[in-house]
Amino acid sequence: MNAEITRFFEVLESYEHLLHAETQAIAAKDIDLVEEILAKKDLCMADLLTSKENLGSDPREDAKINSLIDKVIELQQRNYSIFSSLVEDQRNKKSGKSINSSPNKYNKLRQTYLDMDKSRISNLWD
């Protein structure tokens, strides 16, 4: 692998590690940690996009990278699904309480997953 491909692979691996950390934070229902990891993921994604721009070819042509990309996308989708379920559970728990007690943090984090800006993994291959 040339230096640019190696760099891309390393950053992609970092993103994968963040996804695993995010999975654990979601499972622990540690919203502050999830929010912190989301910020780190955004920085890592920006680095990944920059690294991708420096490549002379499609990184998916490399079987090892292609496999990791698929894994990252799968992890991202799984985390989104699990987090959406968590938000829905919280919404259901809070439905009997006053409107003022609804958790804005959950909605904010859910919206982070729905945002369609350049920091989202779905836009990496567009």
Residue ranges and their predicted role:
Residues 37, 48-51, 57, 95, ...:
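Juxtamembrane helix-loop transition sites at the ends of transmembrane segments
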Residues 51-67:
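Short, solvent-exposed, charged loop/turn and helix-capping segments
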